[in-house]
C-alpha cells in the first residue's frame, strides 16, 4: 500500500510527516535514500526528503545533518531543513531541493572545466566550508558529490552549496571558561573519501579546519587536471602519492595563484584559524586578472560571443577562455566581509 515503508525504500505516493508526498526517488546509499517530495500544503513546492532506515544501522548520520542544518538556518547559501522526525522504522529530514552535484556535472561535461568555472565553484565551496566552521563543525567528507548547485528558479540557482554533513564532527567544546577547541585525539578512525582527504587523515590524525581545506585543494585541482591517484583504491598508496606530488604538478593546468593557495593551506596548522579571506582573495584575483565575471556562463552552459580582450591566455589556457557576460548582474556574489568574520574568536 502507498505509504508503507520497506527496508530500503518508500513507495511513490507515500506521505511523510502528514504533508510531504513522495513523487520521485533521487538516489540511494548505505545511509539511506533521497526522494523528491511535494508539499501537499503548498501546491508546486518541492523538497528533498532524506530517509535513514533503522535496518541499515547508519549510526544516526541523519541526526547529525539535522543538527547542523538547524544551526545554519540563518546563514545564506545553505540548504534549509524544513522538517524532520522519527517513525517506527526510519528517521527522515525534509530539506531544500538542490540541483545537479559537481560530481554529476564533471561526469557529464568534463572531465575538466574551464578556469572561470573552477574558481567560481572554488569560492562557493570555500564560503560553504567557512559557514560550517563558524558554527563549530568540520565537514570531514568534502568531495564533488557533496557539492551541488541551487535548484533552478531558486535564489541560489547560480551558487554551489556544500551538503551532506553525516560525517561532520564538532571541533569546539563548551568549557567553564568559554568555548574552546577540543583537544585532538592521538589516533582516529578513517573518515572521509580517500581521493580528497588530507594526508593527516591518511595517517589517522584528528581532523581540523585545515583538513576541509585540503579537500578543497584536491577538488580545485581535479576540475582542471586528472588527479594522479584517480584510479588508485588503496588508501596507503594514495596517501603516499599525495605526500610526494609537487604543487606544480597538482596544479599544472591551473592559474599560478593556485600555488599560493595550496601554500597557504599547507602553512595552516591544526589549531590555526584558516585565513579564509586570503584564500578568497587569491581566487578572486584569478577572476580579476582574466576579467572573469560571476555572470559568465558556466562551462556546461551555452557560450556567448567571446570577448578577445578577456581571453584566458594569460594562463596559457588555449582556446577555451573567458565567456562574455550574460544577463546576470556583474557584481560579485561574495565580498571580503563574507570571509573575514570570526564569530568563534579562534
UniProtKB/Swiss-Prot annotation:
<feature type="binding site">
    <location>
        <begin position="26"/>
        <end position="34"/>
    </location>
    <ligand>
        <name>ATP</name>
    </ligand>
</feature>
<dbReference type="GO" id="GO:0005524">
    <property type="term" value="F:ATP binding"/>
</dbReference>
<keyword id="KW-0067">ATP-binding</keyword>
<dbReference type="InterPro" id="IPR047916">
    <property type="entry name" value="TTBK_Asator-like_STKc"/>
</dbReference>
<dbReference type="GO" id="GO:0106310">
    <property type="term" value="F:protein serine kinase activity"/>
</dbReference>
<dbReference type="GO" id="GO:0005634">
    <property type="term" value="C:nucleus"/>
</dbReference>
<feature type="binding site">
    <location>
        <position position="50"/>
    </location>
    <ligand>
        <name>ATP</name>
    </ligand>
</feature>
<comment type="similarity">
    <text>Belongs to the protein kinase superfamily. Ser/Thr protein kinase family.</text>
</comment>
<dbReference type="GO" id="GO:0007165">
    <property type="term" value="P:signal transduction"/>
</dbReference>
<dbReference type="InterPro" id="IPR050235">
    <property type="entry name" value="CK1_Ser-Thr_kinase"/>
</dbReference>
<feature type="region of interest" description="Disordered">
    <location>
        <begin position="302"/>
        <end position="326"/>
    </location>
</feature>
<dbReference type="InterPro" id="IPR000719">
    <property type="entry name" value="Prot_kinase_dom"/>
</dbReference>
<keyword id="KW-0418">Kinase</keyword>
<feature type="domain" description="Protein kinase">
    <location>
        <begin position="20"/>
        <end position="287"/>
    </location>
</feature>
<keyword id="KW-0808">Transferase</keyword>
<dbReference type="GO" id="GO:0004674">
    <property type="term" value="F:protein serine/threonine kinase activity"/>
</dbReference>
<protein>
    <recommendedName>
        <fullName>Putative serine/threonine-protein kinase K06H7.1</fullName>
        <ecNumber>2.7.11.1</ecNumber>
    </recommendedName>
</protein>
<keyword id="KW-0723">Serine/threonine-protein kinase</keyword>
<feature type="active site" description="Proton acceptor">
    <location>
        <position position="141"/>
    </location>
</feature>
<dbReference type="InterPro" id="IPR011009">
    <property type="entry name" value="Kinase-like_dom_sf"/>
</dbReference>
<dbReference type="Pfam" id="PF00069">
    <property type="entry name" value="Pkinase"/>
</dbReference>
<dbReference type="GO" id="GO:0005737">
    <property type="term" value="C:cytoplasm"/>
</dbReference>
<keyword id="KW-0547">Nucleotide-binding</keyword>
